[in-house]
Amino acid sequence: MHNAKRFLIAILLLTAQLTFAQSGERRLLTLDDMHRFHDVRDPQISPDGNWVAYTVSSVDLTADKNDTDVWMVSWDGTQDQRLTTSPEAENAPRWSPDGRYLSFLSSRPGKAKGNQVWLLDRAGGEAQQLTDVKGKIASAEWAPDSRHLVLVMADRDTDEPDDEKPPDAGPGGSPPKAPKPIVIDRYHFKQDVVGYLTHPPGRLYLFDVETKKAEALTSDKLEAAAPKWSPDGKFIAFLGEEIKEGKDVDRYNTWNVYVIEAHAGATPRMVTHYDGVHAAASRSRVDWSPDGKLLAYLQSSAAKLEAYNMNRLAIVPASGGEPRVLTEKFNRGVSAPHFSTDGSTIFFLVADDRSEYPASIPASGGDVTRIIKGLGAISTMDEGKDSRRVVLAASDTAPAELYALEQGSLRRLTHHNDALMAQLKLGATEEFSCTAKDGTDVHGLLVKPPDYVAGQKYPMLLRIHGGPNGQDQHSFSFERQLFAANGYVVIAVNYRGSSGRGEKYGTAIAGDWGNKEVVDLEAAVDHVLSMGVVDPDHLGVGGWSYGGILTDAMIAKDHRFKAATSGAGTAFPIALYGVDQYIMQYNEEIGPPWKVGLDPWIKISYPFLHADQIKTPTLFLGGEKDFNVPLVGGEQMYQALRSLDVPTQLIIYPGQNHGITRPSYQTDRMQRYLAWYAKYLKGEEKPVPPTATAAAK
């Protein structure tokens, strides 16, 4: 059945390609294309350097979910093989150093609940489940001897229900027992997707491949993440956060580099003693020099301003000693450090102005060297035998694919989106710069409709990125291109607070949200208007997360916008104190209201407190279970505009967190964007999806 289905899909794709080839005409991007793209990630070079394992995510429209499979491409790019076909996702492929196995993590049905390690034998055969543990495996890394793995795993909460077992029913088939109350005693007690933080911390476990036994390396007094084996296999370096009796670890969020001997009963040794953040564990890794003497890691630039952190590359002796920051004067954030095979150089990725690229620096210190020129976004890099390097690269007109990086040039390895991209006619992306009224230099991107006609003025959409510590860059954006295909000029602006422009630019908005950013965004709109390409009477704005927050600020302060879409935002932050996951940021940047008074909170709540100034028809959206920026932020603004008789609507996505992940809801959201903008900027009525109740239509 599955083979027949795959064959039919292949025939349909081939027919579509042949039809396109015969017509020779490219078409505009449509909403139906949204889930036809494939998301390529996580390249891992094999020990012999001849293969690259990686993952490909695609959408199963029938099941209404995303599916991720493991693939493998040859170094010369001539062979590309899909290795897994399970309906459950497979992630984090890792080669055993002897090249015999390729492991991955998956929650496939098996002996134990949740993510487990599975093995593919290179000699052939189906994947076999390796681990059978009751904890939650976050990562698994091979030891140099190929006989052990280090697991990052949170012990199973004994109060947590087992989803694989039916709920216990009482005598005579009575209803199942009610779940136990949730007991909260942590300072930072909520996290989006995770939920209420009652689970034990992540710990390191040493797993024996032959005996299939896992032994604890670290205790529950140390949160551990991002482990890396030493070249000789005797030690493991990792990022850790100490949990002391009487010390509320959540108030400090201080991660340091640790080293532990790779055997049960060993005591972790703290290598660094930094009163700040060595990059959040999810964004960093520690790397050993080939001789085992040095460790490379990421150190934050602002110890108390993690939200605007610009990571710096640092090294420290593995035995302990004074760290040395190698990129202290570079003034750009870096990520993913790793030593060259000879140990003389450290490679890393740089977040620069509207781009991301690989670079290097001598391990002894010196100047940063950019490895590849041009506009684009290189977001991942791995190095293998004979200094072979593979990167994940994207551009304005090409989704991310794998490339071999050879002598400063890219050689294509994968082609998962080629057939679709060959059909499409895309809008041109241009850079622009402007000056805000306070003299700040502001940069952005502008996308024109594919059939743009010089001299004609188009409706404009200002689409605001979230973060704020992120940026719009030269990578493929389905959203920008879809809006352009629907006849809009789209602008994306890296306002103050964005990454890619240095530490001062990134931290400029700390404790002062929704003010300088608005100045920058207004300057960009003014600049694009002066170019003569947009109609000043047909301006729209929108964004998600911090982009939604700034959308609320824009429509409260700038009355030129005729339509807005505000997703997962808030305009009254004090109402989210203790309700969302940002308690540390509130206290560090603004201060508790009983300590600093209401004035600083009032300043950042302008849109809600001046909602009567808003005339822009606005669509609010959010996830029902968002703990990042809870739905209450959108509900309050919706209620305010509804009370003021300003055209508005609130869309709630059931069961969704901050990021909308269900494919049908992603389509729904984009369809509503298009319909809202078309109605208020073009005077067109476009169909919208059915809603849960007639009142919501």
Q: Would you name each region that the model predicts?
A:
Residues 492-697:
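Active-site-proximal cap/loop segments of hydrolase catalytic domains
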Residues 35-40, 87-92, 136-139, 221-227, ...:
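Short glycine-/Asp-/Thr-/Trp-enriched loop segments that recur within the blades
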Residues 74-78, 121-125, 208-212, 261-265, ...:
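Short loop/turn segments that connect beta-strands within beta-propeller blades
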Residues 49-52, 99-103, 149-150, 233-236, ...:
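Hydrophobic beta-strand positions that form the internal "hydrophobic ladder"
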Residues 62-68, 109-115, 195-201, 247-255, ...:
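Short, solvent-exposed loop/turn segments at conserved positions within beta-propeller repeat blades
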Residues 67-68, 154-210, 248-258, 300, ...:
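Predominantly five- to eight-bladed beta-propeller fold
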Residues 47-48, 97-98, 144-145, 231-232, ...:
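Residue-level detector of Asp-centered blade-edge/turn motifs that repeat once per structural unit
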Residues 244-245, 303, 408, 416-537, ...:
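Cap/lid segment of the alpha/beta-hydrolase catalytic domain
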